């Protein structure tokens, strides 16, 4: 074989190996929704508090989520709990100590703030925004204890079990722009350190928790038929204070009508 042909063959083989080395672990081709004109601002954080202290697996955590409304919901601009340096964990913290200002300002049940984070199931639900075709993202999900990342119902990162702060890394390719359904699951049931971080990096960049602009919350962007919305308790139907006199007058009128009959 001529030297020039050998060179071309060697170069082609090297390129093929390079492409194979960069092949994503998972590929998603069809977005759940169209990409909005605005950037994202985080996922919908959900808490199921004071759960069974023997909740030690993702399967148990998912059963709790499926079994009833979330105790509280809020806007999670980043998945970084407790907020701090990468890999930071804490012991026996309350929600009031670990939720950032945005989370506390958007919390729909402030009664949870004095609660200890132990014996808790969390879900961060919404969508991941892809701006260009063929984006390849590297995701990592270190946690203490168990966690998982699901994209369009596929478990991309599985970090199940009781363990110290650590987690897997996977690459994901999105072939089309749009919003892709995303859930981050987490549970903590042991009286010890706990923590959770979702990190992402585009096209080989070092993964970081600063990906808020790619995260779109469930409440604002989900289709009304999205079954994840069923975990959010409907608003209390108690009338507004200004409407109470009108309601009272209406009831008195009804009673008077019935009495005359």
Regions found by a protein language model. Give the residues of each.
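Bacterial N-terminal signal peptides that target proteins for export
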Residues: 2-9, 242
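Bacterial N-terminal signal peptides
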Residues: 10-18
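Sec/Tat signal peptide C-region and signal peptidase I cleavage site
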Residues: 19-23
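Acidic/polar, compositionally biased interaction segments
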Residues: 24-237
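A short, hydrophobic C-terminal helix/tail in secreted or cell-surface proteins
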Residues: 239-258
């Amino acid at each position: 074989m001529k030297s020039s042909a050998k060179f071309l063959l060697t170069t082609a083989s090297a390129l093929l190996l390079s492409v194979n080395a960069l092949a994503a672990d998972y590929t998603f081709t069809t977005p759940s929704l169209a990409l909005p004109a605005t950037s994202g601002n985080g996922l919908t954080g959900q808490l199921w508090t004071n759960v069974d202290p023997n909740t030690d697996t993702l399967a148990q955590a998912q059963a709790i989520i499926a079994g009833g409304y979330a105790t509280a919901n809020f806007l999670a601009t980043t998945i970084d709990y407790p907020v701090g340096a990468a890999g930071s964990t804490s012991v026996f913290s309350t929600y009031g100590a670990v939720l950032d200002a945005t989370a506390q300002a958007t919390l729909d049940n402030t009664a949870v703030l004095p609660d200890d984070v132990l014996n808790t199931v969390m879900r961060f639900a919404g969508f991941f925004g892809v701006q260009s075709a063929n984006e390849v993202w590297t995701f990592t999900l270190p946690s203490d204890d168990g966690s998982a990342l699901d994209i369009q119902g596929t478990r991309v990162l599985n970090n199940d079990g009781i363990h110290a702060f650590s987690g897997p890394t996977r690459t994901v390719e999105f072939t089309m722009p749009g919003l892709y359904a995303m859930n981050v699951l987490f549970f903590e049931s042991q009286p010890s350190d706990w923590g959770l971080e979702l990190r992402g990096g585009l096209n080989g960049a070092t993964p970081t928790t600063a990906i808020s602009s790619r995260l779109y919350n469930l409440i604002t962007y989900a289709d009304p038929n999205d079954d994840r919305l069923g975990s959010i308790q409907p608003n209390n139907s108690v009338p507004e204070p200004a409407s109470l006199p009108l309601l009272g007058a209406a009831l008195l009128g009804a009673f008077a009508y019935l009495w005359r009959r």
